[in-house]
């Protein structure tokens, strides 16, 4: 799905 990078801090999670 389309996930905002700012929500996760990255593409797959906070890196």
Swiss-Prot record:
Annotated disulfide bonds: none
Subcellular location: Cytoplasm
One GO molecular-function entry: urease activity
Oligomer and partners: Heterotrimer of UreA (gamma), UreB (beta) and UreC (alpha) subunits. Three heterotrimers associate to form the active enzyme.
Keyword Hydrolase attributed: yes
Pathway assigned in UniProt: Nitrogen metabolism; urea degradation; CO(2) and NH(3) from urea (urease route): step 1/1
Cofactor: Ni cation
Catalytic activity, as annotated: urea + 2 H2O + H(+) = hydrogencarbonate + 2 NH4(+)
Entry's family note: Belongs to the metallo-dependent hydrolases superfamily. Urease alpha subunit family.
Enzyme Commission code(s) on record: 3.5.1.5
Natural source organism: Morganella morganii (Proteus morganii)
The protein, known as: Urease subunit alpha
Main location per the UniProt record: cytoplasm
Cofactor note: Binds 2 nickel ions per subunit.
Keyword annotations: Cytoplasm, Hydrolase, Metal-binding, Nickel
Keyword Metal-binding: yes
BP terms from Gene Ontology: urea catabolic process
Gene Ontology CC annotation, any one: cytoplasm
